């Protein structure tokens, strides 16, 4: 049957309880997140996994939980990091910074920083975690995490100066001052704005290469980053439980990184242009996921369900807007935003009464849209969604407890 696991894959998962019924019935349905959590970890436990947990070859972690419940995962230590390093080292545009042993500084959510500090505390037998010392935020010989606050819009001068000190320390490890910057795109954009606000531009040495990952990057944010950096700016797409699946080049073209994986696309709800990603992966030997619905959506160049024709990652299933004109993805809505103004930075749609909404937005320069820009944006949203939407300028939009923004507010 189409999209069913091969004999080789079944051999690798034959002892895992969650798959016993599917193996017996010779049919694997789509694996949903609630099924993964059911009877966890017993539904995944095998003698091999139990032994790996005892020796430290496997560990329990939580997914980042961008705008949904955090999911329990079992994986090898540094599972996500190893696939990151493999992509970095082999990438044609930025592999040179790996080969030159450049230090990696990571500017992303405070949850990521706290995870590193927690791992280090366990390593040294400490009961409490602290992130003040750069040593506690050091993941390995190559990587240091920078951020210590939930909301990057609330960074103060002392926060920026401390992070610049960490970057300078990373530069000193290379004879020419090269370093690699890993980031979430929003965090880096906020960092650029804060550096300018506090007049610290002379202290910010530009990186030799940049990877942004961890969340959807709006077009205006990517353009803003491209305007501020001349080095290659690469996007990685993946998740905590799967590792990385795709990467792009400096021109924005995506390539697959489906090592020990297979991908299928199924239509999302009633849409004929948006597809849900269904991933079969044995990359993680302790928690292989077969026909797993990742919760991510894509669009293809010709509207077909061919994974080789993916042209963009368009958002999460749980953040699809069901409008009168049909389903609108985050990427579709983002097209409306950047079409109206390149100055819009963070935005959040607040649906109200039937087919009415408010769009809260901030801008890169802090000023509201010009009246003609606001009217154009309102028109674009109405034509694409059927919603009467009022743009409202804000100086600040709250970030989620995961350290990531939700573009679509819950009613």
Labelled PLM ranges:
Residues 1-127, 131-153, 173-175, 180-182, ...:
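Nucleotide 5′-phosphate-binding alpha/beta core
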Residues 1-11, 139-411:
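Active-site glycine/GP-rich loop and adjacent strand/helix microenvironment
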């Amino acid at each position: 049957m189409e999209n069913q696991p091969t004999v080789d894959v079944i051999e690798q998962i034959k002892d895992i309880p969650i798959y016993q019924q599917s193996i017996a019935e010779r049919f694997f349905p789509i694996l949903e997140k609630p099924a993964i959590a059911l009877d966890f970890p017993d539904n995944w436990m095998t003698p091999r996994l139990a032994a790996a947990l005892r020796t430290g070859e496997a560990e329990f972690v939580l997914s980042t939980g961008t705008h949904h419940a955090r999911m329990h995962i079992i994986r090898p230590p540094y599972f996500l990091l190893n696939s990151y390093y493999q992509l970095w080292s082999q990438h044609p545009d930025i592999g040179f910074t790996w080969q030159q042993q450049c230090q990696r500084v990571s500017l992303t959510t405070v949850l990521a920083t706290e995870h590193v500090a927690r791992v280090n505390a366990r390593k040294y037998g400490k009961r409490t975690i602290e992130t003040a010392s750069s040593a506690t935020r050091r993941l390995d010989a190559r990587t240091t995490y920078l951020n210590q606050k939930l909301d990057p819009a609330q960074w103060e001068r002392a926060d920026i100066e401390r992070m610049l000190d960490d970057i300078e320390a990373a530069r000193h490890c290379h004879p020419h001052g090269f370093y690699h910057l890993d980031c979430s795109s929003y965090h880096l954009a906020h960092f650029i704005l804060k550096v300018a606000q506090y007049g610290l531009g002379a202290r910010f040495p530009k990186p030799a290469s940049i990877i942004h990952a961890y969340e959807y990057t709006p077009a205006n944010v990517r353009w803003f980053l491209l305007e501020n950096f001349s080095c290659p700016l690469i996007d990685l797409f993946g998740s905590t439980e799967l590792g990385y699946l795709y990467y792009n080049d400096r021109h924005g073209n995506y390539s697959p990184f489906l090592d020990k994986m297979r991908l299928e696309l199924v239509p999302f709800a009633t849409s004929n242009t948006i597809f849900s990603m269904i991933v079969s992966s044995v990359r993680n030997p302790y928690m292989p996921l077969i026909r797993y619905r990742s919760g991510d959506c894509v669009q293809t160049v010709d509207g077909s369900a061919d994974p080789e024709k993916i042209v963009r990652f368009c958002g999460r299933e749980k953040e699809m807007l069901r409008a009168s004109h049909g389903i609108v993805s985050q990427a579709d809505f983002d097209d409306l935003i950047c079409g109206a103004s390149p100055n819009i930075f963070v935005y959040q749609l607040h649906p109200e009464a039937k087919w009415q909404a408010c769009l809260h937005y901030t801008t890169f320069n802090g000023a509201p849209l010009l009246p003609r820009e606001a009217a154009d944006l309102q028109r674009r949203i109405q034509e694409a969604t059927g919603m009467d939407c009022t743009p409202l300028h804000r100086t600040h939009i709250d970030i989620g407890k995961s350290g990531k923004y939700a573009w679509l507010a819950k009613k």
